[in-house]
């Protein structure tokens, strides 16, 4: 009645080798993925791709000088529309508007301005070999005038936000906070770790440092825009409570940065900058 079945042959060479350790690791990964899911991106902004070494600024513009001076790579139209003033220092990057807007000459700063609705757009045709040291002062003054006196939100950009726009931002910090090239570089690098101007651009910043020192032989160097801002109301104009435009939701200054700049205000009024602030 009963029939013997042939013995079952198992060829272990055909089975995947799974150790007890690997099984535990797989279980951990599965449970981790269930517990920790990425936060959804707000619907008003496009989803950013995964950050990698080739993509700086994965979360949008970074505020370098609170509350209203930002650094970024080539901006999209929605990002541009979040600002009042855009300074593009990349020769190869064109504006995304469908028309050329309205043009006027800013005789105060010797710059050509394009106006699109409420946005003032300045295109500076720098490439990586441009000798721009002599141009920096008028651009720094323009940034200071718009951000500090007119309380406008300012974006400085180039193609990647790494070299040319970083140089203009470093130059602004040099003159505004009375820092040398090295300290100003570290100041910007701390807030935007992607920056990395080449040595040719760093040498031009060193040249600009000499220009600043030469022009400041009579006292601390600051642009006329900064001096006028201080004379009016240093606290309200340099660090206004209400920006000219709505805050950019992508990146907002942290509470720690706000408190740090409160200390900077106090140290500037006393004529010195502490090591912690730089």
UniProtKB/Swiss-Prot annotation:
Broad enzyme group: hydrolase
Domain spans labelled Tyrosine-protein phosphatase: 60-214
GO biological process: negative regulation of cell integrity MAPK cascade; negative regulation of MAPK cascade; signal transduction
InterPro entries documented for this protein: Dual-sp_phosphatase_cat-dom, Prot-tyrosine_phosphatase-like, Tyr_Pase_dom, TYR_PHOSPHATASE_DUAL_dom
Composition-biased stretches (Polar residues): 252-278
Region (Disordered): 217-278
Active site, UniProt feature: 158 (phosphocysteine intermediate)
Keywords linked to the UniProt accession: Cell cycle, Hydrolase, Protein phosphatase
Function of the protein: Dual specificity phosphatase that dephosphorylates MAP kinase pmk1 on a Tyr. Has a role in chloride ion homeostasis by inactivating this pmk1 MAP kinase pathway.
Family: Belongs to the protein-tyrosine phosphatase family. Non-receptor class dual specificity subfamily.
Identification of the protein by name: Tyrosine-protein phosphatase pmp1
Gene: pmp1
């Amino acid at each position: 009645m009963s029939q013997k079945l042939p013995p079952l042959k198992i060829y272990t060479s055909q089975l995947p080798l799974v150790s007890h350790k690997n099984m535990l690791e797989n279980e951990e990964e599965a449970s981790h993925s269930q517990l920790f899911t990425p936060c959804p991106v707000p619907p008003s902004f496009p989803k950013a791709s995964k950050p990698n070494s080739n993509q700086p600024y994965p979360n949008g513009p970074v505020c370098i000088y609170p509350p209203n001076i930002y650094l970024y790579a080539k901006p999209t139209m929605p990002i541009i529309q979040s600002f009042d003033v855009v300074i593009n220092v990349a020769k190869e990057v064109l504006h995304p508007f469908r028309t050329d807007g309205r043009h006027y000459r800013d005789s105060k700063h010797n710059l050509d301005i394009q106006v699109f609705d409420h946005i003032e757009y300045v295109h500076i045709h720098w490439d990586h070999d441009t000798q721009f040291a002599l141009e920096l002062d008028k651009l720094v003054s323009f940034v200071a005038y718009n951000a500090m006196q007119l309380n406008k939100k300012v974006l400085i950009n180039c193609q990647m936000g790494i070299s040319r726009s970083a140089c203009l931002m470093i130059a602004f910090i040099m003159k505004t906070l009375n820092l040398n090239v090295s300290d100003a570089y570290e100041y910007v690098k701390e807030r935007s770790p992607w920056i990395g101007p080449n040595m040719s651009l760093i040498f031009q910043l060193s040249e600009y440092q000499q220009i600043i020192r030469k022009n400041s032989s009579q006292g601390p160097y600051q642009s006329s825009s900064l001096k006028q801002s201080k004379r009016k109301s240093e606290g309200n104009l340099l660090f206004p409570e209400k920006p000219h435009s709505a805050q950019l939701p992508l990146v907002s200054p942290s509470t720690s940065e706000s408190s740090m700049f409160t200390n900077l205000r106090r140290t500037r009024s006393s004529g010195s900058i502490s090591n912690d602030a730089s």
